[in-house]
Design a protein with these regions (language model features):
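Glycine-rich phosphate-binding loop signature in dinucleotide/nucleotide-binding domains
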Residues: 70-77, 147-148, 181-183
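ATP-dependent carboxylate/phosphate-activation module, predominantly the ATP-grasp catalytic core
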Residues: 190-256, 260, 267-271, 275-278, ...
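A conserved helix-loop-beta module that forms one wall/lid of the active-site cleft
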Residues: 95-164
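ATP-binding N-terminal substructure of ATP-dependent carboxylate-amine bond-forming enzymes
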Residues: 1-105, 319, 382-395
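Peripheral (often C-terminal) accessory segments that flank ATP-dependent C-N-forming ligase machineries
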Residues: 310-396
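Conserved ATP-binding module of the ATP-grasp superfamily
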Residues: 128-130, 151-154, 163-198, 220-231, ...
Length: 396
């Protein structure tokens, strides 16, 4: 029996489904987390062979001892994953220390975590990216901004999501940024005029896709976080060929094997000198894990399938026979607490209840980017989806 160590299997809350499908495939699933065992979902507890509680997952020594304990008790660990951006570097360090060769090692982390290092691999894939500057002095940053023109975007070179990400529109805003920024390495990029689209896939051991999908985010996540806007994004009914092509070239260039990926691109909404023409695909950043929150469930709703099983099949068998059913648009809307929406919950359910797949409160840890109350709805046409979004975000 193969041993799979799952780091923080309780977060996000839907990740118990990954553990359940691993168990169904004959894997011994060993959990490590800082949530008390009795507070784990019953479905998660029944999926785990054993759970090792640490006082804090932030304490590397504690987590190391947990993996060492499982190694002593059950033998060599075959897989170790969290499927969580926050722990990717921790996962890689543990794999390296325990000689677990089924995933990224510490030496791989620079190219998959640092936005500046990603640029060379996008170039290798033949995909253009925004010009950039690693922030050091105010004068050098000012010269870069003058070269590419305001606005510019600044964000941590190694960061999660849209945290600490800003659009700067003038020298004065740049000066304020330097006076108030955190003591981390920032990257500054020219502003790309485009809509974010993604290539989301489960990749096998030879770089082959076992499942492919994608989503579109009409609004900037940076703006959603910084301005507390509603969060909207949707799973595409059919993955455009140009996005699929860019995704697979990126997978090959980055050497991705045996994992879930969420690769972000821009589709240009206007011609942009040095980048391309309207409609061209531009590299944004790679995320070597599933798209966040409840997006895995949205793939299932959109394609009448089960990505938790497909992923677990990839781990256990390096293939999957799980079928894809009818295809739909699956539209997420995250509303904000306290805002006066024209349609209250009852009106929303009366109008869209037939296609509503999920609704409920979003965990506070995700609410900055995803809103406070989520509605996830299947729709069959783009026109129906656009009407749904108009109704969902309209205020009184």
């Amino acid at each position: 029996m193969k041993n799979f160590v799952f780091i923080s299997p309780n977060f996000p809350v839907n990740y118990w489904k990954f553990c359940a499908e691993l168990k169904n495939n004959g894997m011994r699933v060993l959990g490590i987390g800082d949530c008390p065992y009795d507070n784990l979902l019953p479905e998660l507890r029944s999926s785990l062979h054993e759970y090792y509680k640490v006082r804090s997952l932030e304490n590397y020594d504690e987590v190391f001892r947990a993996v060492a304990f499982f190694t002593y008790k059950y033998g060599k660990i075959d897989w170790l994953e969290s499927n969580n951006e926050y722990w990717l570097e921790r996962d890689a360090k543990l794999r390296t220390e325990f000689h677990i060769v089924s995933g990224f090692q510490e030496s791989d982390m620079e190219r998959v975590k640092y936005k500046s290092a990603m640029k060379a691999y996008y170039k290798k894939a033949g995909i253009p990216t925004a010009r950039y500057h690693l922030v050091d002095t105010f004068e050098k940053a000012k010269r870069f901004a003058k070269k590419v023109g305001y606005p510019v975007v600044v964000k941590p070179d190694n960061g999660v999501g849209a945290s600490s990400t800003y659009r700067l529109k003038s020298d004065e805003e740049l000066q304020f940024f330097f006076e108030t920024k955190d003591d981390v390495q920032y990257i500054m990029e020219e502003m790309v005029k485009g809509v974010v689209c993604t290539y989301d896939a489960i990749i096998g051991s030879q770089g082959q896709p076992l499942f492919e999908s994608g989503n579109v985010t009409p609004l900037s996540i940076m703006d959603v976080v910084n301005d507390r806007m509603d969060s909207i994004y949707y799973i595409v009914k059919d993955l455009p060929e140009e996005v699929k092509d860019a995704g697979m070239r990126t997978v090959k260039a980055f050497g991705v094997k045996s994992r879930f990926v969420h690769l972000e691109f821009f589709r240009l909404t206007e011609d942009q000198e040095g980048l391309g023409k309207t409609g061209d695909i531009i590299g944004l950043e790679t995320n070597m894990r599933p798209s966040g929150g409840f997006t895995p469930d949205m793939y299932n709703f959109a394609y009448e399938t089960d990505v938790y099983k497909i992923w677990a099949d990839m781990i256990a068998f390096d293939e999957s026979t799980k079928s894809i059913g009818n295809r739909h648009f699956c539209a997420f809307c995250g509303r904000r607490d306290g805002d006066p929406y024209k349609l209250d919950r009852n009106a929303v359910m009366e109008r869209y209840g037939a296609g509503m797949m999920m609704e409920g409160r979003i965990p506070d840890a995700l609410s900055g980017a995803m809103g406070n109350i989520m509605y996830v709805c299947n729709l069959d046409t783009e026109e129906e989806m656009n009407e749904y979004y108009r109704d969902m975000i309209q205020r009184v």
